[in-house]
Amino acid sequence: MKLMVLVFTIGLTLLLGVQAMPANRLSCYRKILKDHNCHNLPEGVADLTQIDVNVQDHFWDGKGCEMICYCNFSELLCCPKDVFFGPKISFVIPCNNQ
């Protein structure tokens, strides 16, 4: 029984001592807007491009079409498109990365 407790303690110590490896996935993040206005985006987010004129307050972040941002009053919420829309409909969202 003591051996079992010792093995468990050593195993738990090793698990807690190992640093977690970050996943190779993109994650969500928020950007606070200084002027609290989605129509006048600040200079710091100049890499945003509007998805479509019919889809208000939704932007592609960066040059690709992997991250999408939604402007909600005082902040931008940016997530990978699969997280934002779900994998079943994310492929139908128009992407103009030119």
Swiss-Prot record:
Q: Look up and give the organism this protein is from.
A: Homo sapiens
InterPro entries in the record: SCRG1
Point out the coiled-coil segments of this chain: none
| Family label | Belongs to the SCRG1 family.
Sites of glycosylation? 72
Tell me a GO cellular component.
extracellular space
What is its subcellular localisation? Secreted
Q: Which UniProt keywords apply?
A: Glycoprotein, Secreted, Signal
Expression across tissues? Expressed abundantly in the central nervous system of adult, but not at all in fetal brain. High levels of SCRG1 transcripts are also observed in testis and aorta.
Q: Tell me the leader sequence span.
A: 1-20
What's the protein here called? Scrapie-responsive protein 1
Does the keyword field hold Thylakoid? no
User: Biological process (GO) annotations?
Assistant: nervous system development
